[in-house]
């Protein structure tokens, strides 16, 4: 009480040291934030900067040489095709249709829920990979055929660089990174994707490793050059999201596996988990029409279109739906016979065995426990996807029901295996040693351990070189003739002029296979067009659903094959066709007789006029109606084009892509140096 009684009162004006105004508080917060941000940075000395600059030069020099080697290898392997692409022709193969479409037609097909591949057109979601082709065509200034050729020959160097970036997440060894990139690029040769011009799988090869590389960089799980430290990056997350768009657009079935992978990443990643949830958003918007159609008409089996792509599926390549084991699915996808005594099959068996053992070894490495388990999640999800896809029917052909391709899932598995192989190499960070410390430490156990580690990396590099040779040998041996070529032919010039005169002009191309079988295609360009290839339309065929126009065309073609029929010609004219082009196929005498019979029947029918005849075929103009009235009904297309849902999708996708692109733009950094 006595102390309290003796207290005195002091005016606040005399205690100004204990008070802070708003400006002082703001200054304190700014300095505190600056201090906290500097704690995660490394201040580099001039010698350290010189060390990093030297490492950057070595690293990128090796990457450029690797890319040039890949480009030269593909150009040499397919030199006749590479030489012919400059003539203006279109690529084609056993699985890839040629194209004669303009850039405007490509944009319309890529953004409008209407497919002209069946009859005179049906409502169906656009094939997502056309968005990738549309962007590639911008690089070639609107030349669609040049864009296809560019994708084929640029895919190898870009896929090598893509995996080189992913390998840099796990190891800084330049040799292992370069050999890993070459091994990933040679995987496309082994599967025959270059020989087939399999555009969807080449797209996956280019973008899938890069997408995962930026995912790891986004959450700060990557190795850097000494003395830098890894850090999280929103910019890397945005780039990863953009890289996943072409992957999902090329092979929508990968979406199922990627969803599971991202859910598992949320469990293993320590920080920035919310950022991971935003990575799949742009890809989901890009394939939104396909997803909505698959869910809305799931009871009609339209979900099966997710297991198809823009290539033409065949029973010989995909097989029939069956409950296969993982080894059987891999053998079907690769054309590999595990129990065979053929040297190529034996070499691939040894290759897969060695890669699997190295991937299993990565699970017990103490410095890569979390990362190795993440990549094994990718392996397991890819294998599960391959098993599911081989059980799903997506269309029918002359040999029966065709199953979905197991190749996307197997490719995802191989990506995980090769990533685990890079993990085995260790960090391999070249430590920076100041000049005064060089040579000051005597030899120790640590130095001897370093020699053993380097020797192990040399052995690993030799194994990777052997694997590259095996994959290239197998691909060249097994995929000698996949029908890859450049189509410089097409419809006659007079026919092409008629088609180009109006977007609603059509010509029916027919080819007699036997006396009882006739093939037909509705032509709106000079070639049977790639942009009209639709997985959704093929699912409709698999379930026996066909529009009235398609049924009428099939009936009329069958009647003209059997005999002259003026009513059939009148029906085709009524549907809007301006002519019939009879294709001469094969040099066989019996085949020529069948083709001549079909041509004679068309000539003998009323309302036809022989306009031009070449070695490739004969064009007949339909003269029943006036030229101005010869056009298909585009009412359904105009409704789909003006649909509110289409406009909403395009606007939403554009806004989302613009936002992610702004975040992904490179920024100038004052401190530090991010390492590729």
Question: Where do the language-model regions lie?
Answer:
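Extracytoplasmic
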Residues: 7, 440-441, 445-447, 468-676
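Active-site lumenal/periplasmic loops and adjacent helix-entry segments of GT-C-fold
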Residues: 79-210, 214, 222-231, 481
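Membrane-helix boundary/interfacial segments in multi-pass membrane proteins
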Residues: 92, 190-202, 343-347, 371-450, ...
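Periplasmic/ER-lumenal interhelical loops and adjacent helix-loop junctions
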Residues: 108-114, 279-368, 490, 625-641, ...
């Amino acid at each position: 009480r006595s102390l309290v009684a003796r207290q005195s009162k002091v005016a606040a004006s005399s205690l100004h040291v204990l008070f802070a105004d708003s400006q002082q508080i703001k200054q304190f917060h700014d300095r505190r934030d600056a201090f906290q941000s500097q704690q995660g940075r490394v201040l580099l000395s001039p010698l350290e900067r010189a060390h990093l600059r030297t490492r950057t030069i070595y690293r990128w020099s090796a990457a450029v040489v690797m890319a040039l080697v890949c480009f030269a290898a593909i150009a040499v392997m397919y030199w006749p095709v590479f030489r012919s692409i400059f003539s203006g022709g279109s690529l084609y193969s056993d699985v890839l249709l040629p194209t004669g479409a303009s850039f405007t037609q490509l944009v319309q097909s890529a953004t409008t829920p209407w497919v002209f591949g069946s009859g005179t057109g049906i409502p169906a979601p656009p094939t997502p990979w056309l968005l990738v082709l549309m962007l590639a065509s911008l690089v070639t200034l609107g030349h669609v055929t040049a864009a296809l050729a560019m994708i084929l020959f640029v895919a190898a160097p870009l896929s090598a660089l893509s995996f080189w970036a992913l390998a840099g997440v796990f190891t800084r060894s330049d040799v292992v990174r370069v050999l890993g990139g070459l091994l990933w690029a040679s995987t496309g040769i082994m599967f025959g994707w270059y020989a087939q011009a399999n555009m969807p799988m080449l797209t996956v090869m280019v973008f899938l490793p890069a997408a995962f590389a930026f995912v790891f960089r986004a959450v700060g799980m990557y190795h850097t050059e000494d003395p830098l430290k890894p850090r999280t990056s929103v910019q890397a997350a945005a780039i990863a999201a953009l890289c996943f768009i072409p992957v999902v657009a090329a092979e929508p079935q990968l979406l199922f596996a990627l969803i599971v992978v991202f859910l598992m990443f949320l469990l293993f990643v320590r920080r920035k988990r919310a950022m991971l949830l935003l990575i799949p958003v742009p890809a989901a918007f890009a394939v939104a029409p396909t997803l909505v159609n698959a869910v809305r008409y799931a009871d009609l089996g339209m979900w099966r279109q997710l297991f198809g792509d823009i290539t033409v599926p065949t029973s010989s390549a995909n097989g029939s739906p069956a409950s296969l084991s993982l080894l059987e699915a891999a053998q079907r996808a690769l054309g590999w016979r595990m129990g065979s005594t053929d040297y190529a099959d034996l070499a691939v068996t040894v290759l897969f065995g060695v890669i699997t053992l190295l991937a299993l070894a990565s699970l017990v490495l103490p410095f890569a426990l979390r990362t190795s388990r993440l990549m094994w999640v990718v392996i397991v999800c890819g294998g599960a996807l391959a098993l599911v896809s081989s059980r799903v029917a997506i269309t029918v052909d002359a040999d029966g029901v065709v199953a979905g391709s197991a190749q996307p899932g197997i490719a995802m598995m191989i990506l995980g295996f090769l990533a685990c192989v890079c993990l085995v190499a260790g960090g391999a960070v070249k430590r920076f040693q100041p000049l005064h410390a060089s040579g000051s430490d005597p030899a120790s156990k640590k130095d001897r351990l370093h020699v053993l580690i380097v020797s192990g990396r040399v052995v690993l590099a030799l194994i990777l070189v052997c694997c590259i040779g095996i994959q290239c040998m197998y691909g060249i041996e097994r995929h000698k003739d996949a029908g890859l070529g450049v189509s410089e032919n097409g419809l006659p010039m007079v026919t092409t002029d008629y088609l180009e005169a109006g977007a609603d002009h059509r010509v029916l191309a027919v080819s007699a296979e036997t006396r009882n079988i006739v093939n037909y295609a509705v032509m709106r360009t000079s070639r049977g067009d790639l942009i009209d290839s639709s997985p959704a339309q093929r699912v409709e065929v698999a379930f026996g659903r066909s529009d009235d126009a398609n049924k009428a065309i099939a009936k009329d073609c069958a009647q003209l094959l059997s005999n002259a029929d003026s009513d059939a010609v009148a029906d085709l004219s009524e549907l809007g066709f301006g002519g019939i082009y009879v294709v001469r196929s094969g040099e066989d005498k019996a085949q020529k007789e069948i083709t001549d019979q079909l041509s004679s029947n068309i000539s003998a029918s009323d309302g036809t006029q022989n306009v031009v005849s070449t070695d490739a075929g004969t064009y007949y103009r339909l003269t029943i109606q006036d030229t101005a009235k010869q056009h298909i009904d585009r009412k359904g297309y105009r409704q789909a084009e003006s649909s509110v849902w289409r406009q909403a999708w395009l606007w939403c996708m554009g806004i989302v892509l613009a936002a992610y692109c702004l975040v992904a733009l490179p920024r100038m950094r004052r401190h530090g140096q991010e390492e590729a």
